[in-house]
């Protein structure tokens, strides 16, 4: 530990290329995941804004088939201007490409890489006192597989797809028979992109599990490990068990498309509903793969700024384990309308509602941690509180949707869109921002301006709720999702929702400016622990930024004994 502090500001002798392209250092690879996830997130959020521009008013104003006749570049700029053509023929394929691209990029290439690959790689070894990951070279391979997958996903947007146009327009879930009949190789590229992303995540999961089990500091038992490290450990098991199932499903899809098999084609004895079962067996654990690392971050942020140890450490740990286990036995609640028997529907209803119990343990433990604490509303705490509100709203609407009889009405409406965005998108994204503001001083050695972080939070919080809360009303009115146009009866709430999306996008651009300012001109961090004594995990004993080789001597018990387990 002492050696680590002494060498904290030694000159890094690695060149730029060696450090960022060939690195086996867990901290550098974590930064790369965060940086790449941010870039892909910018693309995906731009798709969102384009879709909300189109949905701002009834009728099709932007996505017109006539723009295709102007060529790619000119047509693109025309599509941003509603009066560019007099008579607009709706370009439904472009709309489907936007939906597919947004879903695939966000699910596989933004949120999981940022939370699991970024924060997990950087801080899990620090929290358990490990010098690095168990398999550093595999860590490097994992990142570059992710980059390769990202490249294929973006390339699929410009490859020949259905209707003689560019891009794959089959939705991120890749449901047959649409995905098996879509022409062009854009869909194949998207499938390969998901394959590479899955391979990257599986390698990362093996690495995380091995590191967690074998490289904890001397004397640090499983029940002494910080909650963020536990969240990464549970997430790694979910990835290891769920992603190979997805890989099997999309491989079968690939052979149906290209090699004449009929796994999912009724004409050859196959069954499209089989694909739904296999996909959602992965798809529901995916929700917790996304949100569990955010749980870990929020636990540390709340404990730090409530200035109290986390309430109920062991229940918090086993609630995460229970959520992970239960996540594998509820998949068919996505399929109530796909012909399940009454008995099957009853089981999946009950199992889905049971997940509310461990989730409730976590919510009330966070509230109990704050109760009676000396709360300091710094920027990371605001994001953590925002996470609590948004995740709770998403959880409550999840209880509504778990009822098969109610889901008959809400299935594939904007009520479902609002529900899963509150849980996954807003919950996970607010967790990411909480982590960035909590740790950016530790990672970069420079601190953000507090006023800017708070302004970013309020812009995003208002924008996010303005975007997605009205979609509950649209769903209750019966507006189906994934449509390019809608009747005039839905115009008001769509207009409000679009305004919220624009505000959220503006907040994201402002955030990029805050990060640029912080990294170039932010106040230098001189203290190892720049928050308070309740930030008591091992990274706060290190310099800011931590040295290249973190623990040249393994931490002793007194270095970590004030961990949240106590």
From Swiss-Prot:
One of its GO terms (cellular component) is respiratory chain complex IV. PROSITE patterns: COX1, COX1_CUB. Its EC number is 7.1.1.9. Residues 549-566 have a biased composition (Basic and acidic residues). It is a multi-pass membrane protein. It catalyses: 4 Fe(II)-[cytochrome c] + O2 + 8 H(+)(in) = 4 Fe(III)-[cytochrome c] + 2 H2O + 4 H(+)(out). This is Cytochrome c oxidase subunit 1. It comes from Cereibacter sphaeroides (Rhodobacter sphaeroides).
């Amino acid at each position: 530990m002492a050696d680590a502090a002494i060498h904290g500001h030694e000159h890094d002798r690695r060149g730029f290329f060696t450090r960022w392209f060939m690195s086996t250092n867990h901290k550098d690879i974590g930064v790369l995941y965060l940086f790449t996830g941010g870039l892909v997130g910018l693309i995906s959020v731009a798709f969102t804004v384009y879709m909300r521009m189109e949905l701002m008013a009834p009728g099709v104003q932007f996505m017109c088939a006539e723009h295709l006749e102007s060529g790619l570049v000119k047509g693109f700029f025309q599509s941003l201007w509603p009066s560019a053509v007099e008579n607009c023929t709706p370009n439904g394929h472009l709309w489907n490409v936007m939906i597919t691209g947004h879903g695939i990029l966000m699910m596989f290439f933004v949120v999981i890489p940022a939370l699991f690959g970024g924060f997990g790689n950087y801080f899990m070894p620090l929290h358990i006192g490990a010098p690095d990951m168990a398999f550093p070279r595999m860590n490097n391979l994992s990142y570059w597989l992710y980059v390769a997958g990202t490249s294929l996903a973006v390339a699929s947007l410009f490859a020949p797809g259905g209707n003689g146009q560019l891009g794959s327009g089959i939705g991120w879930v890749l449901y047959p028979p649409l995905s098996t009949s879509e022409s062009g190789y854009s869909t194949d590229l998207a499938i390969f992109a998901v394959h590479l992303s899955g391979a990257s995540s599986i390698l990362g999961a093996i690495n995380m599990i091995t590191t967690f089990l074998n490289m904890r500091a001397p004397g640090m038992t499983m029940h002494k490990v910080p909650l963020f490290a536990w969240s990464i450990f549970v997430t790694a098991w979910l990835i290891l068990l769920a992603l190979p199932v997805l890989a099997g499903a999309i491989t079968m899809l690939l052979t149906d498309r290209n090699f004449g098999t009929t796994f999912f084609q009724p004409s050859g004895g196959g069954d499209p509903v089989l694909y739904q079962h296999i996909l959602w067996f992965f798809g529901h654990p995916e929700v917790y793969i996304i949100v569990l690392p955010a749980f870990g971050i929020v636990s540390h942020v709340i404990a730090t700024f409530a200035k109290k140890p986390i309430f109920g450490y062991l229940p918090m740990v086993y609630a995460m384990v229970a959520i992970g286990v239960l996540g594998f036995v509820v998949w068919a609640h996505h399929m109530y309308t796909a012909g399940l028997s009454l008995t099957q529907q009853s089981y999946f209803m009950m199992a889905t509602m049971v997940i509310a119990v461990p989730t409730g343990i976590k919510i009330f433990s966070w509230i109990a941690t704050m109760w009676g604490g000396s709360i300091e509303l710094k920027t990371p705490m605001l994001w953590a509180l925002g996470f609590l509100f948004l995740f709770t709203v998403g959880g409550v609407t999840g209880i509504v949707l778990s009822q098969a009889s109610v889901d008959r009405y809400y299935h594939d409406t904007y009520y479902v869109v609002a529900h899963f965005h509150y849980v996954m998108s807003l919950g996970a994204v607010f967790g990411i921002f909480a982590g960035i503001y909590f740790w950016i001083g530790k990672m970069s050695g420079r601190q953000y301006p507090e006023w800017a972080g708070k302004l970013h939070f309020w812009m995003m919080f208002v924008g996010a709720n303005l975007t997605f809360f009205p979609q509950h009303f649209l769903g209750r009115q019966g507006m189906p999702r994934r449509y390019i146009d809608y009747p005039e009866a839905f115009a008001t709430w769509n207009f409000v929702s679009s305004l919220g999306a624009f505000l959220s996008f503006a907040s994201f651009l402002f955030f990029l400016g805050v990060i640029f300012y912080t990294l170039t001109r932010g106040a230098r961090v001189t203290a190892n622990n720049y928050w308070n004594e309740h930030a008591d995990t091992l990274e706060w004993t290190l310099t800011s930024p931590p040295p290249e080789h973190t623990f040249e001597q393994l931490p002793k018990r007194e270095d970590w004994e004030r961990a949240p387990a106590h």
